[in-house]
């Protein structure tokens, strides 16, 4: 049947992220505030929130392994999702801490998707990517892959590597990843 369109007062039908928001909401990967009818597309995404989103997106399953981080007790509502991300090698910590409330950068979000894809062989360059000098050495392959496969383009918004990734950008990345590779690639 026809796909349901979810209406949020802060998502204009012609916004560059409108289709992507509809995609993530209709697939249950992300949700908005349904009482306020807001998706909050410009909001940043915390590392713990991204773990939940990716778990849903990739069809994660509970894991017995523990994730040892100095700033997690194991009682957090998002702990199961973080454990899954870490167990899959999609995310790690920094200096023994996970930093659950830290905001994810554009580059970090792209690295996670690149890992989910199995770190495919990279073809192409970042020669025409305007922020190439800002890409970290460890993120170069992932960003090159995303740029050359159209996961990020200059048409919709600024994909500045170190900038906090927005909910709209995450929605767009996931929709394009699904089109490129398929949702349940984990």
Where are these predicted regions, by residue range?
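Feature responds to low-complexity, polar/acidic, surface-exposed segments characteristic
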Residues: 1-18, 26, 31-51, 55-80, ...
